[in-house]
Amino acid sequence: MSADITETPAWQALSDHHAEIGDRHLTELFADDPARGTELALTVGDLYIDYSKHRVTRRTLDLLVDLARAAGLEERRDAMFAGEHINTSEDRAVLHTALRLPRDAKLVVDGQDVVADVHDVLDRMGDFTDRLRSGEWTGATGERITTVVNIGIGGSDLGPVMVYDALRHYADAGISARFVSNVDPADLVAKLDGLEPAKTLFIVASKTFSTLETLTNATAARRWLTDALGDAAVAKHSSRCPPTRSWSTKFGINTDNMFGFWDWVGGRYSVDSAIGLSVMAVIGKERFAEFLAGFHIVDEHFRTAPLHQNAPALLGLIGLWYSNFFGAQSRAVLPYSNDLSRFAAYLQQLTMESNGKSVRADGTPVSTDTGEIFWGEPGTNGQHAFYQLLHQGTRLVPADFIGFSQPTDDLPTADGTGSMHDLLMSNFFAQTQVLAFGKTADAIASEGTPADVVPHKVMPGNRPTTSILATKLTPSVVGQLIALYEHQVFTEGVIWGIDSFDQWGVELGKTQAKALLPVLTGDKSPAAQSDTSTDALVRRYRTERGRPA
């Protein structure tokens, strides 16, 4: 049994420290330490990360680093990068970082040259997408492919669609992408609307191909294709990531169009693997290489930087500080870039599937809360939806603001004298400032506000935020942002002592759904279910589908 982190002197020291400073206001913290606005910040690659507006002092950061060391964060980090089997429940290495190693790097895991394998797949992906983008690869009728449709779910969908949206400005070969994930037929029908089968290529993306949603959607897509072009067309209009040769051959996929990845890559960590084929098809292999290089910048920073200057480690520790000592349950992710509109949804899977665990890696129950609930929307949309709760609600919600100095698009403001991007970013800076420092009753009253209205306008402040600022949203920056959060997840998981790389919690629901499907569709009235609620729901559903209840 591993040591319980909450029983360590480092945890107790943080608990005592929280009792001392937990109620201190950010206004006071800045007054006591005016330099914190510039000194509690780090530059990592293209990311400027300001963590000064957090309810921490320099002493807090020292104690959090002590906690990380007590939990063995540095040793666990080194074990991950070395390819040790730190996913203990599945006895697997955890090597998503190997997907972005440069070609001349060396890493042998379980007797296999991992880097050579990774670049072999990348080279094959590059050759395939070059042919698509140049028009050398054509469909069954000889026409160019103009749309790739990615069929996947979870990590095989959330990553590719997020990155595609973020990098849409780098589409330069007349190829667009659509993404199908939900087994609700409305999703596939909507995504196929307006497409021409002769100009469409399907990418079936699934790590294990045991996922019912992906199998069902792929089969329906094949039928749409063959109804128009015949069975022989499938080989010219489909690809598979990773290969499952028996199924793929039956489906009709050409084995040259299958691209593998490995069991040491978790689905939610796989957008930089063959699962990103749809992204590469749209932006090209050179831009995809820049995307991978961005990941590697942050990987190397996390691997080598001292903990006091290690951005992912510090941000993960600060997240844990709020979760376990302030009782915060969620973190808002607020990108001031519409191109990152799917980033919060992507992070939901990355963080919540990784750290939503109630037992530690050794199988014993955890003794503290684990897993932050991630959510968010792009600014300024969120300002007119849920920022009211952030500013004046009773719940503490730390927030990450992400913004860019140079826009991907810009237009003049309504009066023609300014930039809409400047207007957007003025809101970014204003929101972090008001969340931190608020506005007092005295200041509001001094403006002539009626006394009975003053309490309603008080902005308490002391709401913590991280500000992440980059010059522009590029392929490299997207990779850097993803890796920044990947390693925060790892940091928190190590402190909590959990396995951040399995996801057993999703399996039972899949099994039960398979068992219930024939109950829903059978010709005869089904046997009673094990609970009266499900039994009543099933019978009502059957009745409304015209089947005997």
Curated annotation (Swiss-Prot):
GO terms for biological process: gluconeogenesis; glucose 6-phosphate metabolic process; glycolytic process. The keyword Signal does not apply. One of its GO terms (cellular component) is cytosol. It is found in: Cytoplasm. PROSITE patterns: P_GLUCOSE_ISOMERASE_1, P_GLUCOSE_ISOMERASE_2, P_GLUCOSE_ISOMERASE_3. GO terms for molecular function: carbohydrate derivative binding; glucose-6-phosphate isomerase activity; monosaccharide binding. Keywords: Cytoplasm, Gluconeogenesis, Glycolysis, Isomerase. The active site is at E353 (proton donor), H384, K510. It is an enzyme of class 5 (isomerase). Gene3D superfamilies: 1.10.1390.10, Glucose-6-phosphate isomerase like protein, domain 1. SUPFAM superfamilies: SIS domain. It holds the Pfam family PGI. It catalyses: alpha-D-glucose 6-phosphate = beta-D-fructose 6-phosphate. Pathway: Carbohydrate biosynthesis; gluconeogenesis; Carbohydrate degradation; glycolysis; D-glyceraldehyde 3-phosphate and glycerone phosphate from D-glucose: step 2/4. Its EC number is 5.3.1.9. Catalyzes the reversible isomerization of glucose-6-phosphate to fructose-6-phosphate. Belongs to the GPI family. HAMAP family: G6P_isomerase. NCBIfam families: PRK00179.1 (NF001211). This is Glucose-6-phosphate isomerase. The gene is pgi.
